[in-house]
Amino acid sequence: MRFRWDWLRPVVLAPYVPTIGPVHPSVLTEDLFTDTLTAASTDRWFLRYDKDIRWSEAKDEIVLVEDIVHRPTETLIPTLSQRGAGTVKIHLYGIEPESVAAATELAQTLAVEHGAAKARIVRFLGPEAPDGRGTRIQLQNFRTAICPAPDGPVRPFDQWPAGVRGTFAGFAEEMTSDGFAFLYGQMQAGKVGPVLTAVVSGRVVGAIGPMEIRPDAIGTPQLMPQYFGVLQEHRGEGLGRLLWRAAMHWGQVNGADYQLLQTEAGGPSDRLCWSEGLTSLGFTYWQVA
C-alpha cells in the first residue's frame, strides 16, 4: 500500500513517524511513512536513517502493514515490538471522537493475535496545545542558534586523567536507570563517539553522550540524541546546563544542522530546553488500550 498525503497530513499534529520517532518538519513526507512499510517487509532491517541503528543489529519494532487503517479523517498505524513480552501500539492520527474506540479495539485484537502482553494507543498533540502532556518533541536549530563553549568542569571523557576516568564506572552504576551502564559498556567496546563529562573533586558526577552526527532521511547532518544525566546529589549546581551547552557547542562546531530531543513535559530537561530557546514541535503520549 501507499499512504495518501492529502488524507494523512491534515491529521499529523506532531512530526512523528511510527518505528522511526520524531523527524524534522522539513523531512516529514509520505515517503517516510512508506519507508516504514518497506522496512516491515525485510528481516527486521534498519532504515539507513533510523537513530536506533547505533545500538542493535536488528529492528525490534515493525509496522503491521496488513492491519493499517487509512481513510480521509483518520489513519491507524499498528506496530509490534518483540522486546520483553511484546507490545502492540496503535499510532492514532485522527481527531474524530470515535477514533479512540477504533484504535482501542484494533490494539486489543492485534495483541491477542500476536501474543503481546501490552496494548497501547499512541496519540499526538500540536505544539500549541494548552494541555500538552507526555513527551515533548524539541528542535535545536544550529543554523540560527548561538552555542559558545561553556566555562566549567566539562570535558570529553578521554581528556581527563586516568584516575578521573576510573570513576565513570561508579557513576554509570548509580545512573543505570538512565542508561549509563549500557553506555559505559559501549564506551569500553569503543563503539560510540565522545562522551562529555562533568567532574567535581576528581569524580565524574554528570555526563552527556555519545556525541555523534548522522544524516537524516534527506542527507542533512543531524546530531543524534544522547544519554544525559547528573548524580542526584549534584543536581541544582548548574552542571546539567553546562553539559547541555557543551553538547550544543560540540554539535555546532562539528557541522550538525539540528538536533531533535524528546523531554518529559514539565520535567527538568523540558524546562532546561525551554529556557535554552529550543522550539517545541508537539507532544506524544500513550494510553493503555
Regions found by a protein language model. Give the residues of each.
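Acyl-donor-binding surface of acyltransferase catalytic domains
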Residues: 2-8, 76, 80-158, 286-289
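Short amphipathic alpha-helix that is part of the acyltransferase structural core
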Residues: 1-49, 138, 145-182
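Residue-level recognition of the GNAT/N-acetyltransferase active site
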Residues: 95, 231, 235, 264
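Conserved GNAT acetyl-CoA-binding A-motif
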Residues: 113-125, 251-264
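Conserved acetyl-CoA-binding loop-helix of GNAT-fold acetyltransferases
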Residues: 99-111, 227-230, 236-249, 253, ...
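Conserved active-site tyrosine of GNAT-family acetyltransferases
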Residues: 130, 269-274, 278
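Conserved donor-binding loop and adjoining core beta-sheet/short helix segment
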Residues: 30, 34-106, 207-228
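Flexible, substrate/cofactor-facing loop regions flanked by secondary structure
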Residues: 148-225
